[in-house]
Amino acid sequence: MAIERQVTEAEEPVSPFARLFSLPGLDVFNIVTIGCKTEGNASTIVEGIKNTLINHPRFSSILVTGHGEHKGKARWIPTKINVEEHVIVPDIDPNIENPDEFLEDYTSNMALSPMDMSKPLWEFHLLKLKTSHAEAVTVARFHHSLGDGMSLMSLLLACTRKTCDPEAFPTFVAPKKNKAKNVCFSLVAWLWFIVRLMFHTCVEVIKSIVFICRASDTSAHIMGKPGATLSANKFIHRIISLDDVKMVKNAMNMTVNDVLFGMVQAGLSRYLNQRYDLETSSKSRKNLHNIGLHGVVFFNLRPNRNIEDLAKMMAKGSKCRWGNSIGYVLIPLGMKPQDDVFEYVRQAKTIMDGKKHSLEPLFSYGLLKVTMEVFGLRGLKTLVKRIFGSTTMIFSNVVGPDEEISFFGHRIAYIAASTFGVPQALNICIQSYVDKLIINIGVDVDVIPDPHHLCDLIIEALRMMNSAAPKKVFHASKV
């Protein structure tokens, strides 16, 4: 196959959300770090991308945001693409003293490096660097205008195959569905579902509107700087056992997501309380327990909520849409210290159940679309900055493959994803892969100068839950 490929498709308009994510001050990117169990081979990756990734029109087109006489007419323009220009192999000393720290610095510096808008907005950096968890590392960077995290992860996983079966796509754990015992039970359950849906939707939508109109997070210790998106970022990740989380999940009869959000909230609470203990008066420490902090959690709005491979997503008649198709919910964060670490998980479950049983994600998506249609791009930008600039963190949990996969012949050890260019000073993305969970934390170091300590506190919360979980199961069995 030739190195250069001529794309003949006609120009395509840019969606409102793609334009939003390319505006100055809202230039949002996704970074995916792939740890490999084998040494990286650039030529293999280049050849693989030629046969997969660039077949998607978004990845072989230039984004024109509108300028000069064509101002306002944003569009995708198909172009010739030289894949080698998008696969970067930096010269790295193989005997570098601290490879893990080098990887953190490298990915962090990518957040400050602008992308060349004259080329398709994606790139792969192949680091021939042996770290604690990988023999080599590939770091992919995608502009958010190409699609939301679900779309981009699907596209990336479409480039992979099962290690045990090189022709098979990755598989994912399917969510369990409750089966009704009889028609009457099914009817009652359906009616109860509708009642709960209407109630929770009204409550959560009203809360969301009140927050947009009046509220804002008040802790300078963890808030991003207003309007700032490109600042001194730091990206770190840790790998923990999925079984440890499932142990707590089973002990409390909750979901993995409940446990993850609970441990994040526990770690964040301890972190912020420690910061206040060191830097403020006792009166301020009391006020910390009452301040209103909020997180943003994204929901996939596609009918099929599992990550799909690109072949299924792009197939004719697929129920899964391509592009930015996500909603968000606003989650209150309790900073009051709890004597019982499980209380954080209980709070997380109560909050998340209300969100999951409401239409708030659809409302938030619809609000952004209506704002765009009525007030235009400037109004949409103002609303987005109002919402995301007044919240403390972004939290996301992505379900990954349940079996080991290979990326163009490179066996994958882990996958860590994150987003940068957002106003929040804290971005936590948790990605599952086989029997692992990868916690990826992105911070603004001017606001959170010690992200490793924050990550330690989050993982320590899980250890505390694990230590107490067997006793909790024993107590429950006796009761």
Curated annotation (Swiss-Prot):
Membrane topology listed for this record: Single-pass membrane protein
Cell compartments where the protein resides: Cell membrane; Endoplasmic reticulum membrane
Statement: the UniProt record of this protein carries the keyword Coiled coil: no
GO molecular function: diacylglycerol O-acyltransferase activity; long-chain-alcohol O-fatty-acyltransferase activity
Tree of life domain: Eukaryota
Tissue distribution of the protein: Mostly expressed in flowers and siliques and barely in roots and stems.
Claim: Ribonucleoprotein is one of the keywords in the record: no
InterPro entries from the UniProt entry: O-acyltransferase_WSD1-like, O-acyltransferase_WSD1_C, O-acyltransferase_WSD1_N
Residues in the Cytoplasmic compartment per record: 1-182
Induction cue: Up-regulated in the stem epidermis during active wax synthesis.
Residues at the active site: H144 (proton acceptor)
GO biological-process terms attached to the record: triglyceride biosynthetic process
EC number in record: 2.3.1.20, 2.3.1.75
GO cellular component, one term: endoplasmic reticulum membrane
Residues listed as glycosylation sites in the UniProt record: N253
Principal localisation: membrane
Function description: Bifunctional wax ester synthase/diacylglycerol acyltransferase. Involved in cuticular wax biosynthesis.
Family in the record: In the N-terminal section; belongs to the long-chain O-acyltransferase family.
PANTHER family: O-ACYLTRANSFERASE (WSD1-LIKE) FAMILY PROTEIN, WAX ESTER SYNTHASE_DIACYLGLYCEROL ACYLTRANSFERASE 2
Protein name as it appears in the record: Wax ester synthase/diacylglycerol acyltransferase 2
Originating gene: WSD2
